[in-house]
Amino acid sequence: MEIDQCLLESLPLGQRQRLVKRMRCEQIKAYYEREKAFQKQEGFLKRLKHAKNPKVHFNLTDMLQDAIIHHNDKEVLRLLKEGADPHTLVSSGGSLLHLCARYDNAFIAEILIDRGVNVNHQDEDFWTPMHIACACDNPDIVLLLVLAGANVLLQDVNGNIPLDYAVEGTESSSILLTYLDENGVDLTSLRQMKLQRPMSMLTDVKHFLSSGGNVNEKNDEGVTLLHMACASGYKEVVSLILEHGGDLNIVDDQYWTPLHLAAKYGQTNLVKLLLMHQANPHLVNCNEEKASDIAASEFIEEMLLKAEIAWEEKMKEPLSASTLAQEEPYEEIIHDLPVLSSKLSPLVLPIAKQDSLLEKDIMFKDATKGLCKQQSQDSIPENPMMSGSTKPEQVKLMPPAPNDDLATLSELNDGSLLYEIQKRFGNNQIYTFIGDILLLVNPYKELPIYSSMVSQLYFSSSGKLCSSLPPHLFSCVERAFHQLFREQRPQCFILSGERGSGKSEASKQIIRHLTCRAGASRATLDSRFKHVVCILEAFGHAKTTLNDLSSCFIKYFELQFCERKQQLTGARIYTYLLEKSRLVSQPLGQSNFLIFYLLMDGLSAEEKYGLHLNNLCAHRYLNQTIQDDASTGERSLNREKLAVLKRALNVVGFSSLEVENLFVILAAILHLGDIRFTALNEGNSAFVSDLQLLEQVAGMLQVSTDELASALTTDIQYFKGDMIIRRHTIQIAEFFRDLLAKSLYSRLFSFLVNTMNSCLHSQDEQKSMQTLDIGILDIFGFEEFQKNEFEQLCVNMTNEKMHHYINEVLFLHEQVECVQEGVTMETAYSPGNQNGVLDFFFQKPSGFLTLLDEESQMIWSVESNFPKKLQSLLESSNTNAVYSPMKDGNGNVALKDHGTAFTIMHYAGRVMYDVVGAIEKNKDSLSQNLLFVMKTSENVVINHLFQSKLSQTGSLVSAYPSFKFRGHKSALLSKKMTASSIIGENKNYLELSKLLKKKGTSTFLQRLERGDPVTIASQLRKSLMDIIGKLQKCTPHFIHCIRPNNSKLPDTFDNFYVSAQLQYIGVLEMVKIFRYGYPVRLSFSDFLSRYKPLADTFLREKKEQSAAERCRLVLQQCKLQGWQMGVRKVFLKYWHADQLNDLCLQLQRKIITCQKVIRGFLARQHLLQRISIRQQEVTSINSFLQNTEDMGLKTYDALVIQNASDIARENDRLRSEMNAPYHKEKLEVRNMQEEGSKRTDDKSGPRHFHPSSMSVCAAVDGLGQCLVGPSIWSPSLHSVFSMDDSSSLPSPRKQPPPKPKRDPNTRLSASYEAVSACLSAAREAANEALARPRPHSDDYSTMKKIPPRKPKRSPNTKLSGSYEEISGSRPGDARPAGAPGAAARVLTPGTPQCALPPAAPPGDEDDSEPVYIEMLGHAARPDSPDPGESVYEEMKCCLPDDGGPGAGSFLLHGASPPLLHRAPEDEAAGPPGDACDIPPPFPNLLPHRPPLLVFPPTPVTCSPASDESPLTPLEVKKLPVLETNLKYPVQPEGSSPLSPQYSKSQKGDGDRPASPGLALFNGSGRASPPSTPPPPPPPPGPPPAPYRPCAHLAFPPEPAPVNAGKAGPSAEAPKVHPKPNSAPVAGPCSSFPKIPYSPVKATRADARKAGSSASPPAPYSPPSSRPLSSPLDELASLFNSGRSVLRKSAAGRKIREAEGFETNMNISSRDDPSTSEITSETQDRNANNHGIQLSNSLSSAITAENGNSISNGLPEEDGYSRLSISGTGTSTFQRHRDSHTTQVIHQLRLSENESVALQELLDWRRKLCEEGQDWQQILHHAEPRVPPPPPCKKPSLLKKPEGASCNRLPSELWDTTI
């Protein structure tokens, strides 16, 4: 049965033991079965008879290493004596010294050094024993190696010296630094020395690369230079290799990458560098291990794991090279401490050894009938709360009194002070202030003033004592707490007083109040502190005559507060000078440590029997002081205390089994003291008299009985490697017996303290949380007995030292500073004879403690000279402080020489000491033999106690490091140094080791102070130095405790006894110094920093003054009295600080109030903004969902209509082809019929559009754009030129004139209303359309009318009777007579590309007839015709004699223009002599005029897009109302859904009118839904490509509004103020992403993307809500009334019915690869489009098949026109790519100034007219061509901005698969 080691370690102790026991039973069973099977073999029994008993022999080397590891020094000596080689190497290549340095075996290390082992031996990693000793922090080994001549500058494989591995602040580091400094080696030399090896390799690599070497070259094992540099940690070399193309992921023969090596050898910086350069962390070596699997530290492993995650993300989404490096802000030197080798595993016992020791514990308990009968458990959940009856809290606080502060008394003398204190004590007012000092009188009874309610009452936000509360300990704590964060400096409480004055109880109350500041962890910390105090009282307190709970050690509590949260986070306890001698002997009337009495009274009889404990009198350590038998109540109380102690031990981390083990050790200590010795020979050699007791003690300690007996009675010494054994006398044996007991108890006490520190230790401390500390120092009090010995001397020496420190802080420092600063003092302080007393004890080298230590080093056989030396010291000392008892206090010689007695004049009085036996009591060093035995103990706790090191203060070294002071010197040694910094340094620093041998070791040892022996005196000196050092870092708060009487009686006040205490404490001096002195002394900078709010408030304009002046101004502004200014400091009274703090607090409250108001205002504003945004989001979402639903329905309807339209169009195309000959024959007949029925049709019957006589673009695109959105019609060339002129006169004519001959250059100055004539019966005709025959039926073909022939016109015919008078020169006047009809229909961008019907042949010249055109007057002018009357305008054009064919047609295309906004002044600024002089409402018309579409009137501003011609009669047709299903706002009755809607606010006086055909579906007009605000104009882009809209028409059955919504004026596009003749800009974006196409036949379109400037729609305003502000509005309303309808003459229809002209318009040009490629990609063999998105600028085009216009398939009688398909424009454009027309169109599109391009177009047309060529010949003949206009720059306004979306519906709504 096998089990994983990790799983075994994770199991609880009890479960693991059961599992191991079962496994062991199975192993034994298997073993027996195997043995039985083996015995059955033949001949086994015979061989067994002749065989000897087998013995296992181990190699001496293995046994020697095992003995060194387990500190079995006796075994080591035996093995060395038997011949074991001390020069044996271990498996890592190191020597036995490496093993001794690893396991801190200094004794064996000294033996090995004496035997010649090399102290500088290096293992496989070049580690010396010094490296290991520093890494493990074993100062004894370090000092031993240094004294043995070890080279401290040797480097390991990583280039680190031993100092690099020594943690800063440790003793090992101190030894090395002192040694190097003693020998003249500084850190700069060390840094340069360390850089020699990496710089050498850097030089070699540079030379190798400069000579052309391959940076990735491998050696025989596949190792590259990068591998070597990464393993060695040479960062500069690695950087150089990477700069020259080094492969990051290159592998050697074992598949190790440089990252593997850097991680394995702990090169943290290189790991980071490789990861920054994108090294792959997922690569594995030959062992299938990634770099993170073999990382030398957890930090490197964590960094690699993060890199692995980042690498995986990089594979999904590539990251930049610097991304990984920026994920974690690693510092340049990430770890101060270099990563240790793996051979330095944690110092813990293997799990097998732990289980073995535990089993032996259990076996021992079973053998001795131990205490525990239940199964062991790892931890037993205990109630953390202390047991006790819950009583209601009582609060009884006295009101504040005038005498709360003694410094305010009017009369200051000893009597008055004593009287006030006595009066307050009688009123249970035990606390009194002396300034900031608290005076406490022990009441010897419980007072209800320490409850949690009282603690909360004293909570303060500023630390100032509430005026309604009396003085209290809690108020002093509050002041210190707030001062901690105000000063950012640790605080400390110093409690002083005699034994029994209440210091320990006061410290507990301080801790209790501070735990209330622990936040959420208050209950936990408070409970832990209670349990910790319980343990300390049991193991460190004793009962004396002065105090029933007297502290026998010095404790220093350190409470840690989080600086950010200002809460208590953890604590730590420091213990000093445990009174160990009390264990062995107690003074008269005093007891031993309380724990033994708790065991004797608290354990049951059975438990005591298991521990062999009897009554108190049976044990020597407990029966020295005769005591009366404890009462039953006392025993019961001890039993309860023991139960509480067990629970406390459980809380701090001890299991029940471990608690029982502690009790076993304590019982062993008691039994150890009972061992007696006897002499059996004349040599007085000691032997143990009771071997059974010895065996019992050895069993409890789990050591060998013989070894324990030998260690107690003999001593082993080594001289030059030889072991010398010396027998002890009885006296010496008893001394070592007691010394072993004291050492065991003191180490156990330190072990408990360390365990409690682990419990109180803050878990957040390791996270580098900034903490501030509050310390509480509780020292044992001053004492005096009838016989005062060495113990009382140590206690009183400590009190003397602390009293001197208090006086220094309170008096001497102030006195010195006042003298230095030139400030006068009213009081003076004299230290008295304290300095003489302290010098007598602590002076070196002639002080009492030094003398005692010297005598303690003498061997036992030498007679002591201590009395003589002591008398000599007394004679030389200050007689006022110390004098010999040979003389009395008056200097008289005494009769008897006491020898070791002397008298000390302490601050508290005169005390005589007798130091007999002080030398033995001072010794505290166990013999090596006893250490050998205790280190081999199988008791886990005992083994740990004696293998752990002791600090210089005598305490056990803590198990966990002090993170607060942790650091490393390698941060100084590893600083980056460039190559230039060491160039030229030829000094060989490797020879620095010679400097280390120049001086001896005496000075070195003196500086280390390591020469001091391990004595009580040395521990006392070190402890006091440590305590004073802690206090000096803090701001002190003094609490003086006073005993009211010497009998421990409550309510008893001994005036004489209290007066004596007040005098030696110096209460009167304290009162005077606080009243007249300056206890608050701050430097100028500290003052301004502490009271910064006041300084900022009072020194607004005076901050440039000196610091002293600023401090003075602040104090003057605060109106304080009694302060003084020194040279560098401010001297304040103690109440000044409180007043200044109050002023700061008031300012802070005002600031907080202001901030609260502002934050509330901002919060409300933010809330309102969020609510508004939320409402807008909800509205937008609802609107979006509704629009999406509406558009989806519209799309469905459009697809249905498209299907029907495609079918009709196809049938109409076939019918047209079949009826073409018939139409040619009946041309004249139709003309005659049309001429005859002209008047009749005008008066009655519906009006018709004839498919053969009009441009299909006008109706098809108009209807199709209701689905597309933006305008597809733009003003013609003439209207563009005429928009800038608005000066004209109304026509007085109301009847048509005679029909004169007309000039071909005559232009119709048609008004906007005439061009955009409306249908008054649009709503009635919508319902009639469903009942009439479809276009493809027979009825439709019979009703077609033949248009009349084109009349002959005179070029000199002028237009008369127009709405406005035409002024200025006409461009047609300069044109030759031989170019009639040369003017072509010019389409601005977005205009449908239609192939116009050919003009009449020249043979019709004689048959010319006049053409009547119907016009309306200006409805808004008073002199205009009436709205119900028509104005007939006469136009007549005669062809010249030499004229060619009539007006042909050519194509222009571009972007559809939006409205041009112009100021009125710009409008009037047009020059009169411009090329275009027709006023804006009347465009310069083209020779071809399709029938006009008349819409319901709306006040529009766009100009007509129809190609008006002087030869084209007008025919008024009512268009059907389209159902768009866009759910736009419904227009009122009388308004057309097909007409543009513009608000009055959007149209200015100078705005150019647009075509009604454009406005019908203009995206910038009212018909389009709201769009996003336009982006800024983009840079010029490529010219927009033409598109071909869908070949279908939508005719819904019901009319529906077109306008979807109106944007506000803020959503308008930027207004453009063009110059005269400026070209229009690009139109707005389309409202739909795609044009729906027929499910039967796909759209014949070549949709291209084109740029345009987004033009948002203007706000919608229905006509009914807008006043008539212009003649156009009035005329539109006239049209809406239906009173006037224009009629197109039959002649006009005949003009456009040209015969004999048919062109295949579907042939695309091969010269334009882009067009052909796009066409081939987007069209199938039937020329069908597939999902190409419409351009937003080329928003209309007309389709045709084979050059023929395709009708819409609707009958004429229904009022619908036969409209052409929108594919004609594209196919025509593709055919004539190389023609002059195409070139002109391209130049127009690329023109930066379109007006210039239009002027060039007119010139080109004029040139064509002059040549007199037939337009058809121009189209069909390639030679010689007229050169096109010169190229112009690309217009910047024609490009669509990036990101401007023309789509309102997503592409998903258009199913391209239909």
Curated annotation (Swiss-Prot):
Cellular component GO terms held in the UniProt record: cytoplasm; myosin complex; nucleoplasm; perinuclear region of cytoplasm; plasma membrane
A Pfam family: NYAP_C
Compositional bias of kind Basic and acidic residues: 1219-1245
Biased composition (Basic residues): 1346-1355
Keyword Phosphoprotein set for record: yes
UniProt-annotated binding residues for ATP: G497, E498, R499, G500, S501, G502, K503, S504
Domain Myosin motor: 401-1145
Pro residues composition bias: residue spans: 1478-1499, 1570-1587, 1656-1665
One BP term from GO: negative regulation of cell population proliferation
Annotated region (Involved in CYFIP1- and NCKAP1-binding), positions in chain: 1111-1377
PROSITE patterns the record matches: ANK_REP_REGION, ANK_REPEAT, IQ, MYOSIN_MOTOR
ANK repeat placement: 59-88, 92-121, 125-154, 158-189, 191-217, 221-250, 254-283
GO function terms (MF aspect): actin filament binding; ATP binding; cytoskeletal motor activity; protein phosphatase binding
Biased composition (Polar residues): 1533-1545, 1715-1731, 1763-1773
Residues covered by region (Disordered): 373-392, 1219-1250, 1282-1307, 1326-1409, 1448-1674, 1697-1731, 1747-1778, 1821-1844
Keyword Repeat in annotation: yes
Top-level taxonomic group: Eukaryota
Changes after translation: Phosphorylated on tyrosine residues by FYN upon stimulation with CNTN5.
Keywords: Actin-binding, ANK repeat, ATP-binding, Cytoplasm, Motor protein, Myosin, Nucleotide-binding, Phosphoprotein, Repeat
Domain annotation IQ: ranges: 1147-1176
Transmembrane segments: none
Location within or outside the cell: Cytoplasm
Recorded family membership: In the N-terminal section; belongs to the TRAFAC class myosin-kinesin ATPase superfamily. Myosin family. In the C-terminal section; belongs to the NYAP family.
Record's subunit section: Binds PPP1CA and/or PPP1CC. Binds F-actin in an ATP-sensitive manner. Interacts with ACOT9, ARHGAP26 and PIK3R2. Interacts with components of the WAVE1 complex, CYFIP1 and NCKAP1; this interaction mediates PI3K-WAVE1 association and actin cytoskeleton remodeling. Interacts with KIRREL3.
Function: Myosins are actin-based motor molecules with ATPase activity. Unconventional myosins serve in intracellular movements. Their highly divergent tails are presumed to bind to membranous compartments, which would be moved relative to actin filaments. May be involved in targeting of the catalytic subunit of protein phosphatase 1 during brain development. Activates PI3K and concomitantly recruits the WAVE1 complex to the close vicinity of PI3K and regulates neuronal morphogenesis.
Record protein name field: Unconventional myosin-XVI
